[in-house]
Amino acid sequence: MSSNIFGSVPILVVVAIQLLLVHNVSSQNVTNDYLNHQCNNTQGRYTHGSTFEKNLNQVLHNISNLDLRYGYAYVSNVVAYKVSKDPNIVFVLLQCRGDSFGSKCHSCLSTAVSGLRERCPGNRGATIWYDQCLLEISSVDSEGRIHYKRMFYMQNPTNVTNDPKRFEDKRRDLLHKLMLEATKDSKENGAKGLLYAVGEMRIGRNKMYAMVQCTQDLWQTGCHVCLEWITQMKYGEFFYRKPGGRVCGRSCSFRYELYPFLRR
């Protein structure tokens, strides 16, 4: 899949058609495939041995030393980055899928760092997606913002033929239920949770499996807005009659399949 400049289209629409066949459930279907990347040419480039590169390497090293027990990190080389004027400031966001925390998140981080260096060498801003994590490097602070332009969708090329309207109603109901689950307060202390939810629903002889997730720099309200945007407003029509599909974004994502694709 080719790289894309962030500002080239109103909403990045990358249709990566995948043949998502139903696999043996015992295989768990847990993969960490490369999905897409975006090289942000508007932020400029850095050279080998530059201060920016040294700062970037240090931030990535600092993240690799975290336990990543909650699968998330947003780290800069400057403590007071909200008011810093440093031209070589670096921001790195890592968000791992909700079933890929801890050591699994570390593994995906390593893969993503290598992938980003290969696909966007020298870019001061870039994002890469894998099945189990999202990694973004940037020279601009983007914490807490909903990024509507940095997203793409993937869908199963086949169509549901048996009662497609009922299938669509069930799909929407499940994703809506998971959106509410992901954005509710934590039961322990009323704070925000992990902004992640998984579920399943019986549809005739089949069972649908789904997940929704937001990056943890958002709060519940922002997460709800982002998930509503990708599940209903912007991309909902693209999945009519599709037995599997996903939207991957910088701020939120969802996926549904007719086979389990997450760790138990």
Swiss-Prot record:
Domain Gnk2-homologous: 34-142, 148-261
UniProt signal peptide: 1-27
Keywords in alphabetical order: Repeat, Secreted, Signal
Compartment(s): Secreted
PROSITE patterns for the chain: GNK2
A single GO cellular-component term on record: extracellular region
Family, as annotated: Belongs to the cysteine-rich repeat secretory protein family.
Full protein name: Cysteine-rich repeat secretory protein 26
Origin species: Arabidopsis thaliana
